[in-house]
Amino acid sequence: MVTFSRRSLAALAAACALVSSGTSSAYAQQKPKIAVSSLTLPVFNPLVWNIMKASGFDAKNGFELDIHAYPSISAFYAAFSTGETEALIGGPTILQKLYQEGVPLRIFGTGFTLADLVVFAKDPNIKSLADLKGKQLAADMGGSQFQVIKIYTNAKGIDLGKDITVVNANFAVARAQLEADRVDAALVIEPLASITLRQSPSWKIIFNGAQGWKEITGQEGWEIVPALRAETIARLPEAPKMLLAALQDVANVLHKETDAADKIAVDTTKLPPGILKAAVDSGRLQMIVRPAWEPATRQSITDMMQRAVKAGFYQAMPDNKIIYAP
């Protein structure tokens, strides 16, 4: 008969506990990683990932978020295009361009609406984009936001670039040029819109992207939407649904726990306190997460792409595989 001393039993129990702990730790580490493109700029795009990571929504939904932050939008998209990262949240018409250039991407949901895209003017006599005829607008001509403005003005019979002179400038420079009276209007997005209204309350918003898009299409449009690379979906078939659930969790924090979201924005993107809250409370920052494969949502995304083709940005529509389907 084999007997054990009390000391031997204690040692055996400790060893079992250590093995059990190691097994649990190893199991926890088995969550698949998803590498995402983010930005070091003080904008709301990286805040989505920051809230997701800080709140543990990645682990809650079965994956580990691996954030890769880049100092420029071009590097942000380039990393996704080359496969350095596997997911991002980007402009639907920019993703359209990448797809047609051979990037194997799949749009699987929606993100921010066009409500945070605004055009500011200082002159009280300028009340709409039509009033900018013969004047100058500062805008980033390489961004999807400019494409939205171009599509809108086309629908209104305004030749943007001819009737309205466009000065190419990123959002911060566009705002600075309006401040210095070098242009008559500036295209900006959140959080710069809320910062601008705090610093220059006399400036007027003469165009809002969501309102303008609904005016010409009868439906909402999307500023940014989430996409995954096709090989990531092949490796991890549940990735779209896991990410979509985590994005919905982020949207809930933005809209229902705005003070907590504002604190994360201050801590991680160095935004002034209250700016995110102002953007959400004003209705300019609207995060609406829906599956892209639902018929109405798919149509709202592809409609933007069709209008980009009609406006002359691209020659043809992408095939149906650009939208993920379970």
Name each model feature, range by range.
Residues F4-A11:
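N-terminal export leaders
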Residues A11, G134, R198:
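Phosphate-coordinating loops and pocket residues in cytosolic domains that bind phosphorylated ligands
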Residues L18-A26:
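C-terminal segment of classical bacterial N-terminal signal peptides
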Residues A28-G161, T165-N170, D184-E190, I206:
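Short, glycine-/small- and polar/acidic-enriched structural segments
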Residues A59-K60, A210-Q219, M287-A296:
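Short, solvent-exposed loop/beta-turn-alpha elements that line the ligand-binding surface or hinge
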Residues T93, V167, A172-A265:
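Pocket-lining segment of extracytoplasmic ligand-binding domains
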Residues A234-F313:
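Secondary-structure end/capping motifs
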Residues Q315-P326:
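Hinge/cleft segment of the Venus flytrap/periplasmic-binding protein
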